[in-house]
């Protein structure tokens, strides 16, 4: 406070450069200087500089607390941003894993479908081959039966033309003896 008073007194020193008696009530410079000093004295007496300093100190404390709060908010925002970035990376990785899994499953399903198709084709081929073999066996059997029928008919025609009743009777007797010999 003393420094402020000395500064105010020194600030009034240019008024001393005026002409004429300085300490006269007719000198406006003296009146202005006197009014300024009285005003400064009233301010000092009313403790205005202390109040101003107190207000400035409170404002400085308030600004410091706001700065600390801003720092805390900035750190919290950084933490939230880092958390968001991590979660975004995790989601992207999970999406990539899901896509890869779906691709693998689709590929496995396609391979399974190919294998099932090959197995179905193999079964159908085997069934067709079995049907062909069965048809061949049936055809061979039918041809044999037909050949046997034709051979029996031809043999009976040949035997009927060549055999006499006495030879037929002798052949029947011989066949009966042969059957009896085989059963006994």
Swiss-Prot record:
Annotated localization: Cell inner membrane
Keyword Glycosyltransferase applies: no
A GO MF label: proton-transporting ATPase activity, rotational mechanism
Keywords recorded for this protein, A-Z: ATP synthesis, Cell inner membrane, Cell membrane, CF(0), Hydrogen ion transport, Ion transport, Membrane, Transmembrane, Transmembrane helix, Transport
Topology term for the membrane: Single-pass membrane protein
Parts of the chain that traverse the membrane: 4-24
Keyword check for Ion transport: yes
GO CC, alphabetical: plasma membrane; proton-transporting ATP synthase complex
PANTHER family in the cross-refs: ATP SYNTHASE SUBUNIT B, ATP SYNTHASE SUBUNIT B', CHLOROPLASTIC
Protein's job: F(1)F(0) ATP synthase produces ATP from ADP in the presence of a proton or sodium gradient. F-type ATPases consist of two structural domains, F(1) containing the extramembraneous catalytic core and F(0) containing the membrane proton channel, linked together by a central stalk and a peripheral stalk. During catalysis, ATP synthesis in the catalytic domain of F(1) is coupled via a rotary mechanism of the central stalk subunits to proton translocation.
Subunit structure: F-type ATPases have 2 components, F(1) - the catalytic core - and F(0) - the membrane proton channel. F(1) has five subunits: alpha(3), beta(3), gamma(1), delta(1), epsilon(1). F(0) has three main subunits: a(1), b(2) and c(10-14). The alpha and beta chains form an alternating ring which encloses part of the gamma chain. F(1) is attached to F(0) by a central stalk formed by the gamma and epsilon chains, while a peripheral stalk is formed by the delta and b chains.
Family: Belongs to the ATPase B chain family.
Protein's name in the database: ATP synthase subunit b 1
């Amino acid at each position: 406070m003393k420094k402020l008073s000395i500064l105010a007194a020194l600030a009034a020193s240019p008024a001393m450069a005026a002409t004429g008696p300085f300490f006269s009530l007719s000198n406006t410079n003296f009146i202005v200087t006197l009014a300024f000093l009285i005003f400064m004295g009233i301010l000092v007496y009313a403790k205005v500089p202390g109040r101003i300093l107190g207000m400035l100190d409170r404002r400085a404390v308030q600004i410091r607390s706001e700065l600390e709060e801003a720092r805390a908010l900035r750190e919290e925002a950084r933490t939230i941003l880092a958390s968001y970035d991590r979660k975004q990376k995790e989601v992207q990785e999970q999406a990539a894993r899901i896509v890869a899994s779906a691709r693998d499953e689709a590929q496995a399903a396609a391979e399974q479908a190919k294998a099932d198709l090959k197995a179905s084709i193999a079964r159908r081929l085997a069934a067709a081959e079995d049907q062909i073999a069965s048809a061949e066996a049936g055809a061979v059997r039918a041809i044999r039966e037909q050949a046997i029928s034709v051979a029996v008919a031809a043999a009976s025609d040949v035997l009927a033309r060549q055999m006499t009743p006495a030879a037929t009777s002798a052949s029947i007797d011989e066949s009966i003896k042969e059957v009896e010999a085989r059963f006994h």
